Design a protein with these regions (language model features):
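Active-site-proximal loop->helix
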Residues: 46-52
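Active-site-adjacent "lid/gating" segments in soluble enzymes
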Residues: 24, 28, 94-162
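Active-site loop/turn elements of alpha/beta-hydrolase fold enzymes
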Residues: 37-38, 63, 88, 115
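Phosphate-coordination loops involved in phosphoryl transfer and adenosine-cofactor binding
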Residues: 4-6
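N-terminal Rossmann-fold NAD(P) dinucleotide-binding loop
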Residues: 18-19
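Short beta-strand "acidic-cap" motif of Rossmann-like dinucleotide-binding folds
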Residues: 11, 27, 31-36
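NAD(P)-binding Rossmann-fold cofactor-contacting core
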Residues: 35-44
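A structured beta-alpha segment of the ubiquitous adenosine-cofactor-binding alpha/beta core
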Residues: 10, 52-103
């Protein structure tokens, strides 16, 4: 029996910290169900080739579609937590924001992982790992004198997902 056996987590697919967080929870025994998007312009890895998909179940839903949202609501009805990494307001527009989910499952822990937080001057700006570590000053230490700073890894995303 694993530490998180019996816990059900819903993960809305994305890049970086959300999938890493879901992977770690699945590794610890939680049942993690990743909701993949049917079509996206994001450079997401093929679900079967994505290392962060390990130990997870997955389902492909178009959350802009009413029938898909009904299935989403059914999935969260007995879930313990949800992992979401979209810009502020995206899930609310889809009808699956925290208040929408609370009506279906008041005990659901709604975890949001965003680059710049839920409010503030950068909250609605898209961001990626290199943006976060540059603004934090970490990127400066990764380059040589008079050479470009090349990050060693996706440090900011990994830090956000753990």
């Amino acid at each position: 029996m694993s530490v998180l056996s019996g816990y059900k987590i819903i993960e809305l697919s994305g890049i970086g910290p959300g999938p890493l967080c879901g992977m770690l929870l699945a590794d610890l025994g939680a049942e993690v169900i990743r909701i993949d998007r049917k079509k996206t312009t994001m450079p997401l890895p093929e679900p079967k080739l994505d290392i962060t998909g390990r130990n997870k179940k997955s389902i492909c839903l178009n959350l802009k579609n009413e029938k898909s949202r009904e299935l989403f609501y059914k999935l969260i009805s007995d879930a313990d937590a949800l992992i979401e990494g979209f810009r502020p307001g995206v899930t609310e527009k889809l009808g699956i924001g925290p208040e929408d989910c609370k009506k279906i499952n008041p005990k659901l822990v709604y975890g949001r992982i965003t680059g710049w937080g839920q409010d503030g001057p950068l909250s609605n700006v898209a961001g990626h790992d290199i943006n976060y570590i540059a603004l934090a000053g970490s990127l400066f230490s990764m380059g040589g004198k008079d050479k470009p700073s090349i990050p060693y890894n996706i440090a900011g995303d990994y830090a956000g997902g753990t």
